[in-house]
Structure formats: structure tokens, C-alpha cells
Amino acid sequence: MSQTLVLKIGTSSLTNPDTGHLALATIASLVEVLSQLRQEGNQVILVSSGAVGIGCARLGLAERPKAIALKQAVAAVGQGRLMRIYDDFFTSLQQPIAQVLLTRGDLADRSRYINASNTLQELLKLGVIPIVNENDTVAVDELLRFGDNDTLSALVAGLVQADWLFILTDVDRLYSADPRIQPDAQPIVTVERMEELAALNVNAGAQGSQWGTGGMATKISAAAIATNAGVRTVITQGKTPENIPRILAGESLGTQFQPHPRPHNARKHWIAHALVPTGKLILDDGAAKAITTLGKSLLAAGITAVEGEFQSQEAVCFYDSAGVEIARGLVNYSSDELQRIQGRQSEDIPQVLGYAGAETVVHRDNLVITG
């Protein structure tokens, strides 16, 4: 049966950890596996890191640059070399590829999000393997950066409604702690629900490699995003991409995250994960219960505080009285308007604002439970 597969490979798997030079044997193995999966009728997308790391090696830089302008320049050098190498390897197997560079802004805008989805779907129909990376050269605003390709791969998996997301990294699976530091760390084979990780006392840490940006914490976060979209997610060893067909065949390799039994629909997945929240609404207990358990829209009467500056139709986070995030949604009022009507009954709003606004602050169709 044909399936849609998204595979993310990180800088630590693509390069030598000491020199930053390309691990050509790993790339050759990866290309062979992906080409074979495509020949078997599967649709395949590769999300590849490595542009900055490869650029550093090409320019003789001893470490990853921290200054944004320099990092963007280095990424431009590395991205061209990375794609040339992929093209050489894939062409030797008669497998066409395409370069797709995305920014967070591309996915935060609804029309561009849909257009990106349409483009990827057309490439897949043509039998092409899209190679996706963040467009580091133009992603200036830190709020509009993915920050790491783990998050990007999870959003792409949701974008194309993939069946599988494989996050290839420098360990064979998720452990209760870093096995390179703590030899008694326990392997985790299957995660049915993300809440299980807290019960297992998983210490993911936050450190990426010298040449990359994503640590294990970002991979767990990416798994949460993907599984909420109904995508089965696997964290496994990047140096052995030949394990991917074995996992698809049912072997227990890596850590497998089961898809959420009630995944978000495409629009709600976009609201929950592709948008960048610009403010916070603090809710009283009645409003928190109404939206989380009763499926209600949010009314002004249930808001106790407004934080941040935002306009109508921007994304905000909702917090309960204990300070826990419980939902996200698109607001029908600006932060200035909400400061004036918070705690008010709906029938009082026209008098307070001087005009008739929306009946709800956030309609339930534009609201996603996250907590």
C-alpha cells in the first residue's frame, strides 16, 4: 500500500561531528533507501538540515556562527553545495528531486500555507522527492523562524497529511536520559500518549550538536506536533537509514510515537502549530471548563487578563487560573479592545466599544485545545 513518508535528517547525521565535513557514505545510503521507497510507490519528502554546517566547513569556520547575518551568508553557501550533492546522488539512481525552502511566515499565512501544500502535493504526484529546508538566508525575525528542522519536519508532515514521520538523529532511540552520559538510561520503544514521557521521568535535555540546532527536546516536541495531526512518528538512528524499510515492515527499531486517536483537522492543526501566538488571555475557571470540556466558544465575560499586543484574527494562547496553557485560537478582537471588554457580558460590548463587534471573542471553530 502506498504511503506518504516524511524523513528528517539532522546535521549530526549528515556530517562528521569533529570536522563538519559531509558523511558521504550516510548520504549515499539515505539516497538509496529513499529512491527504493519511491520506486515501491510511496510518496517521499526529505527534510534536510546541514546548510549552515556544510557552509562552515566550506568556508573553513571553526564553529557555527552566532551572528544572524553571518549565519545567513554561511547558509547560502552551504545550501547550494548540499543540493548539488543530493542531486548528484539521486540522479545516479534516476530519481528527480526538488528544492523547497520555507520560512515560518510561509506557513503562518493561510494562503501561503495552502499554496505550499498544493506545491508539495503536485511534486509528489510527479514522482519527485522534495528536499525541504528552512530558508535561513531570508528568515530574519526570530519569531518567524522554525528554529530547528525537527519542528519544520513535523509541520510538513501535517501539511501533506503524511502517514509517517521519521526523525533521524545521532542515537538509536529515545532514552530516559542521554545514554552517552548516563549508561543506565532506559530505552523507550513505544509512546502511546505524550503524557507518558513525564511519568517515565524523561530528561531530554536541550543541547544540539556543535553544528546543528536541535536536541532531543525539540524532537519530542516535533513528535507531539506530528502525532496531533495523526502522523505516526519514529525517532531513530540517522547513520543507518536502511532501518527505515525494516520499521515500515513492523520491526521494533527506534522509538515509535502512536498517532493521536482524535487528530486535529487541517485547519485546527494550522492554528495550533503553524501560527505564532502574539498574546495571552487568562481565563476564569468557568470559561476554561466551557472551552475545554463543553466545546464552547470563548466569551469576553470569562477573560480575567489580557497580555501582549495583537490585532483581530491573530493567534493567541489561553491560560487557566493556574497559569497552564489550555488552548490556542484566532481572536475576533484586538488586545486594545479586549482590555476594555474583558469580564463584560456580551450584551454590554456595543456600549463599551461604541460599535457592535463579534458575538464571541474566539469562535469554537477557530479554537484548538492544547492542554
Swiss-Prot record:
* EC number from the UniProt entry: 2.7.2.11
Instruction: Quote the record's binding site residues for ATP.
Output: K8, T169, D170, T213, G214, G215, M216, A217, T218, K219
What's an example GO cellular component term for this entry? cytosol
Domain named PUA is located at 278-356
Residues where substrate binds: S49, D136, N149
- Drop me one GO molecular function for this one: RNA binding
Q: Give the UniProt record's GO annotations in the biological process aspect.
A: L-proline biosynthetic process
Which keywords accompany this UniProt record? Amino-acid biosynthesis, ATP-binding, Cytoplasm, Kinase, Nucleotide-binding, Proline biosynthesis, Transferase
Its annotated pathway reads: Amino-acid biosynthesis; L-proline biosynthesis; L-glutamate 5-semialdehyde from L-glutamate: step 1/2
- Claim: Kinase is one of the keywords in the record: yes
Say what the protein does: Catalyzes the transfer of a phosphate group to glutamate to form L-glutamate 5-phosphate.
Tell me its family: Belongs to the glutamate 5-kinase family.
Q: What is this protein called?
A: Glutamate 5-kinase
Gene that encodes the chain: proB
